[in-house]
Design a protein with these regions (language model features):
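Active-site environment of divalent metal-dependent phosphoester hydrolases
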Residues: 119, 145-151, 171-174, 224-227, ...
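Active-site neighborhood of phospho(di)ester-bond hydrolases with catalytic His/Asp-centered motifs
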Residues: 112-114, 137-145, 164-167, 218-221, ...
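Metallo-beta-lactamase
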Residues: 67-71, 79-81, 85-87, 136, ...
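Active-site HxH/HxHxD metal-binding segment of metal-dependent hydrolases
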Residues: 118-121, 128-206, 303, 309, ...
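Loop/turn elements at helix/coil->beta-strand transitions in domains of secreted/extracellular proteins
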Residues: 108, 136-138, 160-163, 212-214, ...
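Conserved beta-strand hairpin/beta-sheet module of binuclear metal-dependent hydrolase folds
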Residues: 75-130, 134, 228-250
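Intrinsic disorder/low-complexity segments
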Residues: 1-66, 158
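Accessory terminal helices/loops
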Residues: 50, 62-76, 236, 250-337
Length: 337
């Protein structure tokens, strides 16, 4: 999801809109004090120059995500969050608001979402701090083809050799690095590294590894290939239905009426809500922490009940997003008359 009114870490209920708080500034390297002497100090000077270049490179890499206006206004997208177990073999390895999920199996692991171009080191650290191997990532999936969920895919695929599996309607977007997006194609700040897809998915396709099976549900609208993932988890003898919502949100500037680059956008949104309303849900998750009140649920995690088991919250969130869509559609339709 890309939205210009999401500010976390304190997330308001259900809609993913949040209040802004202070953000710890990143460390900025001090200007390097070059050694000016020659002779015996020449080697020190060379080493110093190389060190300065290395530090500056780290700084540039670390701030590359900030080139996009959405990342500067949403610091929670890059703020680390200690990884944790959700249930069974399902773990959270994302940031404070950009969700990424690791599914661990005896035959390797499945990662959902690569997030920003700057996110892979953070995701890797989260995976390894849980005691798992980053190199064991065998399959990489995404929620949808926006830069805040798939810009890190090229690096993760290169480093782990994971098989990249994407819904067919979003394949042209991820393989073009966002240049074929129906709304953001002409905005270079929304482009990301082009990544070759290894398997093209369609609605209802399954992804299986090591005894775990996920089902891909096409829930288009936010993008043409937005994907909601479902799987079952065993937790304390119970079978829990997990739903990872792709995105039901209408971004600022989206045309729901007479959209020349996406004529069926309104129909796709309506179909999405039909699908989401029918899915059985015990554990409610999504592409952004704001969807499922991540910050609030973490405060309850030490209790006896698993706060991520939230079927009521799921139904409320989907109903709210559906109402928001219908209101926006009605508004845009009225403006055309």
């Amino acid at each position: 999801m890309i939205t210009n009114n999401v500010r976390v870490p304190h997330i308001s209920k259900r809609c993913g809109i949040a209040s802004s708080r202070s953000f710890n500034e990143k460390w900025v390297p001090r200007p390097f004090d070059f050694v000016r002497r020659t002779g015996g100090r020449r080697q020190s000077w060379i080493v110093g120059v190389l060190f300065a270049f290395f530090v500056i490179s780290l700084f540039v890499t670390g701030t590359s995500a900030q080139k996009n206006p959405f990342t500067t206004s949403n610091p929670s997208w890059v703020q680390p969050l200690p990884p944790f177990k959700i249930a069974g073999n399902l773990y959270y390895v994302g940031s404070q608001d950009l969700a990424a999920y690791l599914i661990v199996t005896p035959q390797g692991n499945i990662l959902i979402n690569s997030n920003l171009e700057s996110s892979p080191p953070q995701i890797r650290q989260a995976i390894e701090s849980l005691g798992f191997k980053y190199a064991d990532t065998k399959i990489l999936l995404i929620s949808h083809g926006h830069f805040d969920h798939c810009a890190g895919s090229a690096q993760i695929k290169r480093e782990t050799h994971a098989k990249y599996e994407v819904m067919a309607e979003d394949v042209p977007v991820v393989e073009s690095g966002g240049r074929n997006d129906f709304h953001y194609a002409d905005r270079k700040s929304f482009w990301f590294p082009q990544t070759k897809v290894d398997r093209v998915l369609h609605d209802g396709h399954t992804v299986s590894l090591g005894g775990t099976t996920l089902t891909a549900h096409l829930t288009a609208g936010h993008t043409k290939g937005t994907t909601t993932w479902t799987l079952d988890e065993q937790d304390n003898g119970r079978t829990l239905h997990v739903v990872i919502v792709g995105s039901p949100n209408v971004n600022p500037g989206y045309k729901l009426v007479n959209n020349k680059t996406y004529p069926q956008i309104a129909a796709d949104y309506r179909h999405q809500f039909e699908v989401l309303n029918k899915l059985p849900c015990d554990i409610f998750l999504g592409a952004h922490g704001g969807y499922f009140d991540l910050s609030q649920k973490l405060l309850l995690k030490s209790g006896q009940k698993n706060p991520f088991i939230d079927p009521v919250g799921y139904k409320a969130y989907i109903a709210e997003r559906q109402q928001a869509f219908e209101s926006e559609l009605k508004k845009q339709s009225a403006e055309r008359h």
